[in-house]
Amino acid sequence: MSARSSVRDGATVAALCACVAACSTTHKPEADPARLVPIMKAMDKNTPTPGGAPTCTPDQMIGGATMTQVTLLKISGEPANPGPEREDWINPAELDSPAARELIDPATDETTRRQAAYELLSAPFFLVYRIDNVDAPMALGIKDLKRGTVGSRVLRYDTQGDIVCVKVMNFQSSLAKSDWAILKSNLAVMDPKIAAELRTDLHEQMLKYVRALGRPEQP
């Protein structure tokens, strides 16, 4: 083989390798995040009254894009009403699909935002965790010595933002943590450290209930 032929063959191999490398780099599909805004606004508007929608079965709550009501409002650009129901500790980030988190993170670059928008728009349905009432005075720093209770619902919407079904999800502070807090609350005002412990406990109780959503109902 001549030197010229060897150089030519080497160049051909290098070009082929470059082509393979370029072709193997898949570009994730993108979509305009603005397309999500009317869907999110429709979902917020179509929040049903209690008893105003069918009850979701366990299998209806598996496979969609998930998010908290707070995240829904952030994506839609609508402000959240003030109150404990919209605070971060009871609207945990763990309940958001990664794509939803990326959309509301101010540090996300534009390409990633567009890829996240495409992913959400491709979801078969949306599952929204909505906190309706936080009756947990000790967790909120108020000295009212009773066990904390949170009323919430899991709302399934179709891809247009219309309600499909609802699952009521009410939960309480763990009895052990609640009793501990009552025993320790011997001051005139609520100890902020105890209140923080109770918020963490309610956060954990919520995640425990969420993990059980797709399981069959107990007889």
Q: Can you describe what each PLM-predicted range is?
A:
Residues S24-A107:
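A structural "domain/chain start" motif
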Residues R35, I39-A42, A116, D201, ...:
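Charge-rich, solvent-exposed alpha-helical interaction surfaces
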Residues E110-Q160:
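Surface-exposed short loop/turn segments
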Residues K167-M169:
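Short hydrophobic alpha-helix segments
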Residues S174-P219:
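C-terminal/domain-edge helix-coil "capping" segments
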Residues V20-A22:
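C-terminal motif of bacterial Sec signal peptides marking the signal peptidase cleavage site
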